[in-house]
Amino acid sequence: MEPAPSAGAELQPPLFANASDAYPSACPSAGANASGPPGARSASSLALAIAITALYSAVCAVGLLGNVLVMFGIVRYTKMKTATNIYIFNLALADALATSTLPFQSAKYLMETWPFGELLCKAVLSIDYYNMFTSIFTLTMMSVDRYIAVCHPVKALDFRTPAKAKLINICIWVLASGVGVPIMVMAVTRPRDGAVVCMLQFPSPSWYWDTVTKICVFLFAFVVPILIITVCYGLMLLRLRSVRLLSGSKEKDRSLRRITRMVLVVVGAFVVCWAPIHIFVIVWTLVDIDRRDPLVVAALHLCIALGYANSSLNPVLYAFLDENFKRCFRQLCRKPCGRPDPSSFSRAREATARERVTACTPSDGPGGGAAA
């Protein structure tokens, strides 16, 4: 049964991070009190706005600082320029852009309007979609990269180079532009209930394109990539169980297994953080639920915040799971304004060289072309 378009149905909601922008009048917590005069605001709405602002502020601070440090460390230290770290740079760039939009969204929640104009509306919404697609595409390529390193070590010598990783990153952004650019075009600001709303305006019939967009994003930004990642790690698990020594060197094997484990943890964190909002939006779209229910509204905002939290979680995971990132973070914090001291970094690296071979100490020379 086709849903009947309501008044103003040509103005449809964005899909994920700004989903609440579409519901300023439908969701009591996101806009004016539905039962009160214009401009009235319930205590629960104000409390939710304050909680969202506090959470977004923390995520923004940790996410921006952490991801900038990750990118700076990879750019600054030659030994960090491995194929895996080039993908991590791409992920950090997408996460940094996403967290940079949080101050604007916090202001929107507090002010109950979008005061920043249509240009920033287009930028914020398109960045959300760029982050969603570039993140999952990059994680998928990282999983394929680990599969090649573990299961096809000879082919890895040619495929797993920083130059090819950079080219793949560019292709990922071009591919994500297939979604990001249309979102930028469709993003508009419109007056509604005495406020300004930043939202997507789909072509007619709007309800149809809105539903198709949500389902396609769910499939191609979540289900299909997760299936590919699952297959890659399933094949890697079989390989790791059947072969005691993958590379002929115990140190290189430790490096392979450790970096593979790190990528798996990062992928797992992404799934945990993004699965709720993907599922919630599909349920919101296909199931008749009470969108004014305070619990439904709170669940929506919690799922959105969880997706953003993933952007600040990744740098923390790198610091805990990879000794080279940990050392680079320490080095950058010790000398934030000066040039890096190669000798101190070399000493720190050599101190653990007998115990581990990491992405910071590639086996094929300073270029790190096919390092783990």
UniProtKB/Swiss-Prot annotation:
Membrane-side (Cytoplasmic) residue stretches: 76-85, 145-163, 239-261, 322-372
UniProt tissue specificity: Detected in oocytes (at protein level). Detected in brain cortex, hypothalamus, hippocampus and olfactory bulb. Detected in oocytes.
Extracellular side: 1-47, 111-122, 187-206, 285-299
Biased segments, Basic and acidic residues type: 347-357
SUPFAM superfamilies recorded: Family A G protein-coupled receptor-like
Residues with attached carbohydrate: 18, 33
A GO MF term: neuropeptide binding
Disordered as annotated region, ranges: 340-372
Any single Pfam family the record assigns to this protein: 7tm_1
Domain of life: Eukaryota
Membrane topology per record: Multi-pass membrane protein
Primary site of residence: membrane
Lipid attachment locations (S-palmitoyl cysteine): 333
CDD domains: 7tmA_Delta_opioid_R
Keyword field: Cell membrane, Disulfide bond, G-protein coupled receptor, Glycoprotein, Lipoprotein, Membrane, Palmitate, Receptor, Transducer, Transmembrane, Transmembrane helix, Ubl conjugation
Any one biological process term the GO annotation gives: regulation of calcium ion transport
Function according to Swiss-Prot or TrEMBL: G-protein coupled receptor that functions as a receptor for endogenous enkephalins and for a subset of other opioids. Ligand binding causes a conformation change that triggers signaling via guanine nucleotide-binding proteins (G proteins) and modulates the activity of down-stream effectors, such as adenylate cyclase. Signaling leads to the inhibition of adenylate cyclase activity. Inhibits neurotransmitter release by reducing calcium ion currents and increasing potassium ion conductance. Plays a role in the perception of pain and in opiate-mediated analgesia.
Protein name per its UniProtKB record: Delta-type opioid receptor
Organism for this UniProt entry: Homo sapiens (Human)
Gene responsible for this protein: OPRD1
